[in-house]
Amino acid sequence: MLRIYVDAATKGNPGESGGGIVYLTDQSRQQLHVPLGIVSNHEAEFKVLIEALKKAIANEDNQQTVLLHSDSKIVVQTIEKNYAKNEKYQPYLAEYQQLEKNFPLLLIEWLPESQNKAADMLARQALQKFYPNKK
C-alpha cells in the first residue's frame, strides 16, 4: 500500500501557494515540494492532491492501493461526497475523478494538522523555494 500525505501553504488568500507531498511505503519514503501558483488556500489543497496523484501515476506507483491523507476537510468531504458545492472546486473534483480511474483502489482520509506535520513543513518550504521574498 502507498500512503500519500499532502498539504498546501498560501501567502495571502488568494496568493502564492506551495505544496508538500510525502509518499510512504513499507520500503521507502519520498518527499516533494511543488509550486501551485496563485490560488486560494482551498484551491491549493485540491491542487497539491492532484499533483500527488499525477506523480504517483508517472512513477508507476498506481498499481497498488493508495491511501491519501489530507488535513483539508473541504477537500476530503468534496471527494467523499463526490460533489463540489462551490463552483470553483468542480474542475478539481472532475480532474480527481479522472485520475482515480488509474488506481485499483484509491481512498482518502482526513487527519488533523498535528498528524500531517511532514507535509505541512514541505508545503512551507515550497513557498520559500518557489516564491522567495523579493527585496
From Swiss-Prot:
Q: Which domain of life is it from?
A: Bacteria
Instruction: Using the record's annotation, list all stretches that form the RNase H type-1 domain.
Output: 1-128
One of the record's GO cellular component terms: extracellular region
Per the UniProt record, the source organism is Enterococcus faecalis (strain ATCC 700802 / V583)
Residues annotated to bind Mg(2+) 2: D7, D120
InterPro entries, sorted: RNaseH-like_sf (IPR012337), RNaseH_domain (IPR002156), RNaseH_sf (IPR036397)
Q: Which cofactor does it need?
A: Mg(2+)
What this chain does, per the record? Answer: Seems to play some role in the cell surface expression of a chromosomally encoded receptor, named enterococcal binding substance (EBS), that mediates mating aggregate formation. Might interfere with the synthesis or assembly of EBS and function as a cell wall hydrolase.
Q: So what EC number does this one have?
A: 3.-.-.-
Protein name from the UniProt record = Putative hydrolase EbsB
Q: Gene of origin?
A: ebsB
Molecular function per GO: metal ion binding; nucleic acid binding; RNA-DNA hybrid ribonuclease activity
Tell where it localizes.
Answer: Secreted, Cell wall
- Which family would the database say this protein is a member of? Belongs to the RNase H family. EbsB subfamily.
Keywords assigned by UniProt, alphabetized: Cell wall, Hydrolase, Magnesium, Metal-binding, Secreted
What CDD domains does this protein's entry cite?
RNase_HI_like
Q: Where is the signal peptide?
A: none
Q: Which SUPFAM superfamilies does the annotation name?
A: Ribonuclease H-like (SSF53098)
- Keyword Cell membrane part of the UniProt annotation: no
Annotated residues for binding of Mg(2+) 1 = D7, E45, D71
